[in-house]
Amino acid sequence: MAKISPTQRSLEYLREQGYHVEIVEKWNHWARIRQDLWGWCDLLALRKNEVLAVQVTASAVATRIKKIQDSPTVQFVRDAGIRIEVHGWRQNSKGEWVIRVEDIS
């Protein structure tokens, strides 16, 4: 069975919450790296009167929060009224995937 990425898990989670979601990271062929929107955003989610930017990780939520807070773009995003969340995914003792959502708007 194919392994489901944290990004795919967050896509499903957000769609269940009623968001229209798109992946906004891209593959830079020349540098051979993934580049996130604004340097930290993996997903952009829309719902009536709401825009949500999401950074997704398998772990290291605190590291991702610091990365966003240190970003020169984060204040522009906040000033635009865009909410910001970090989604951390892990397996619990039963082997079930659970999400940790940190709102850092």
For each of these PLM feature ranges, what is it?
Residues M1-S105:
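Catalytic phosphate/metal-binding cores of nucleic-acid and nucleotide-processing enzymes, i.e., regions
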